[in-house]
Amino acid sequence: MNYEFKIIAFTNDPQFSISLTRECNKYGFSLSFIDSESEIINELDDKIISVTLLDLNNFQEDPFQLCETIKTDHGIPVFGVLNKFSKHVQERAKKTGFDLIFTKKMLLRSIREVVIHVSNE
């Protein structure tokens, strides 16, 4: 299958991972789950628009530092997801360079629209 859009996800939330996989399959988006920033380079392809999705609640590495590293080293958009909005986390994420922040539920409900928006940027 030829994909035009790829999500590279850092999460250890099994329920969210299953739901995200289901939604990506429904719309034909490529999805990879990785455990470290060093794996991103293997997932990038010049022919495919890629974004990174960082779980702000359930990841062992510091997602804010990870965002800065990804933006500096790879220059791809970084989205943050969390279980429930927190003004403090949202402000910190914005300062760190996250492109967009979603609750997991909101992202799953609107993933198609988000991908269309990012693809048109």
Where do the PLM segments sit?
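Receiver (REC) domain switch/output surface
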Residues: 111-121
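Conserved phosphotransfer cores of two-component systems
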Residues: 70-75
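Acidic, metal-coordinating helix/loop segments flanking the phosphotransfer/catalytic sites
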Residues: 35-51
